Structure formats: C-alpha cells, structure tokens
Amino acid sequence: MVEMAQGNIPFFEKNLKEIIRRNVRAGRLVYSTDIESFARKAQVIFLAEDSADHLSDVVMRISRLAPTPPILTIVTPVSVGTASALEKSLKDAGLQATIVSQPMFFTDGCAVEDFNWPDRLILGSTSNEAVHILKQIFHPLVMRGVPVIVTNQATAELVRESATAFVATKISFINEVSALCERVGADAVSLALALGLDKKIAPRCLQPGAGMGGVFAESDMDSLAQLAQANGVSLKVLSAARDVNHSLADRLLDKIALALDSVENKDVGILGLAFKPNTNSVAGSSAVSLAQSLVAKGARVRAYDPVALSDAKNRLNGSVRYCDSAYSAAEGMDALVVGTGWPEFRALDFDRIKHLLKKPIIVDTKNLLDSSRLRAMGFEYVGVGRG
C-alpha cells in the first residue's frame, strides 16, 4: 500500500503512475488497509477483488460494518450468478446491501483511456436508487454522451464474457483468412482495412497476426464455456475461435522454420514479448508461446521488450537470453522476429540491424514494419497474410 500511495504500481500502464501521484498529492486518492473506516463512511463501495472467495468475504464484512445498507458495485470480471449468490448469502446471514454488477472493459495498455472514454456503462441492478446514484457518480461520462445500459445482474455479468468471446472470434477470423491470403496472393492488411471500413464490422481487432491475450481473456472464455456446458448449450463458434488462437504460435513457428529451412541449432532474436504494446503483461502472449516453441525445437533465442522482460522471465524460466536493447537481440542472429507491435521498433536503424544479423531475415508477426522499404534494403521480409 505504501508503494502504491507513492505511485509505484507493480505493472506498466500508460499514464497511470502520474495520475495516481497527482491525485494522492491533491488528497483525492487515499490508500488504506482499514476496511472498517471505509465501510462506516462510504455509501457506494466499488469492489475490485479478483477472487470469488475473497469477494464474498469482503461483501459480508462490509455489510456487517456499514451503519446503513451500502451499495456494493462489482467491477471485476465475475462468473454469471455471482451477484445473485452474494445476495442470497447476505439474506441468509440477515444482512442488507445492494449488489450492482458493473463490468469494466479495460484493455491492457489503454486502461486510462478506456476509463475516460468508455464505449458504454453497464449497470446491472434492479434498484432504481442504486442506478440513480451511480449515474451521478459517472455524471461526466453521462453528460459526454456515453450510453448507459441498465439491466439485471446476470445480463451485466454475461456482457463481459460475451464481449471477450466475440473479440476472440473476430481476431481468429482475420487470422484464418490471412492464411488464405498467403495461398492466393492476397494482402491481409489491405483486406482487413477494407473489412474494417464496413460499419457492420468496424476496424478494431482486425490485425492479422494478433492473438487474444491479457490477464482475463482466457478466464473469461473458460467461464463462458463452462456456463454454456452446465446449461446444455454448445458454443461451437467460441470453441473454434479458441482453437485458432491457440494455434497461432505454431503457425508463426512454421513461418520462421520455412525462412530458415529449420530452426534447429539456429539463433533467433525476438523483439517484443508483451501480448500487445503499452503493457508489461505477457498473459496469453503469442510471442512468449513462440519463444517456447522455438526453444523446444532446438533454437537459441534472444529477446528484448521495453517493459515486459521481468514478467516474461517468470514464464520462460531461463530458456531465453534477455537483452537490454533491440540491437543486442539482433546481433549474430539468423533471423529477427517482431513479436509485439511496439511503435518504437519502426524507428530502429535497420542499416545497423542488417549488419548485426548473420542473415538479413525479418519475420514480422504483427505486420508492423514497412515491408517495401526493408526489401529494398536487401532484407528477406516475411509478414503475416501477405501473399
């Protein structure tokens, strides 16, 4: 808590450290482990506990301490039925509180922007009073025209998981079609642009080579799949999307193996290990899975990432050599792989990169770089979905 109060958050999130420090200094943000003081003073308490057991304990404890029935708003991902189960536990214990499901849709690396400019606010509650108070709290967003969806708790809980599954389906679709592009001489990047301009489709999450990662992505889809199975519903599209997402690293490995004839006893540098730019999270990262696959096939791997090396080390267990710059990751390598679409990689000195590599081969799994420029410089450039 002391570290957090100083703005030293244990993860990387663009602009968040500065916001925390500014608001702590202004007295608007206080960190404390004294749950009793909050329970006795606050009318509305937002619960960001990520463990179902802990969430239940916190709800019961606050409800016992609060002088009047509090409004307890759950903002972290929870399985469908959580709010209903909490209400039953409260009733059985003779306690009172209003439980609201308000799923937040924060994207790693864009959380501050997502909070300030959300696509919508979801309020899952049958209490008109709770809805009115929450609309007052989020008045600046409401006045800005952010849509507010008021629904029951189960629907609010299901929105989060369904949104994750839909995005996974969209990502998996463009990755499947990008494989077809490679066979027929089409360009998946241009195809994705054309598809995204269709108002029925929209451009976000249509980047060939992108995977479905993040801390909650797998758990959201697991929870939705389990809910469907428990209720006798077959979610075939979700199952197929997950299969495609899980196979992405194998497809990328095949690209590298084809460019090098084989990856065994080859030296491969990877630029980027985070699952996406502007985050240190490697949860569900296709780049980390690719590094593991390369090592398993006998390759020697070096890697560089601006912020995710610490998290990656916990996943890769010493099987990869970590570098302090992109140039160190390229030196003496048979191929250089772009694993994460960090914008700074576009600004690298590719003349220098070319002289550092044993072979001027770049496998760009995110289609981040200027392929025409690199080929003109003498690189063998391999992208995703670019026939």
Where are these regions (language model features)?
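Structural/interface elements that position substrates and couple domains in central-metabolism enzymes
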Residues: 1-387
